[in-house]
Amino acid sequence: MKVGVLLVTHPGVGSAMLHIASRIIGRTTLPIKCLEVPTDASLEPTMESARSMLEVLNAGDGVLVLTDIYGATPHNLAKEVACNQPGTTVLSGLNLPMLVRVFNYPDDDLDTLSSKAAEGGSRGIMTCPLQSVGG
């Protein structure tokens, strides 16, 4: 069994991240789904979709839920649904380095995968010194 991964994001973010990560790393063996939450979405049907996806993804090893913006509607919805799902971790601040890290460690347990995802996301953010290529 493997940890499931659910991306809960604003429209276009999760699907684009999955597409790009798949192009960089290749297909993942992790069960992974994406729920994109429109700003005008009805909350209860969207929460039911999230619950259903979590149940499908959790084959016993848990689910890592990745959200794009802490405190935004997709994150709040994911957090609310995850509260009633044992073995679920919610991690906010989704970026491409975070998702690539998840793709790179498909056999890790939930706690380890969550830590590696957070580390990958954090290490992928840096200020780059500016200098010309020629010196």
Give the residues covered by each predicted segment.
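N-terminal loops that bind phosphate or other acidic moieties
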Residues: 2-135
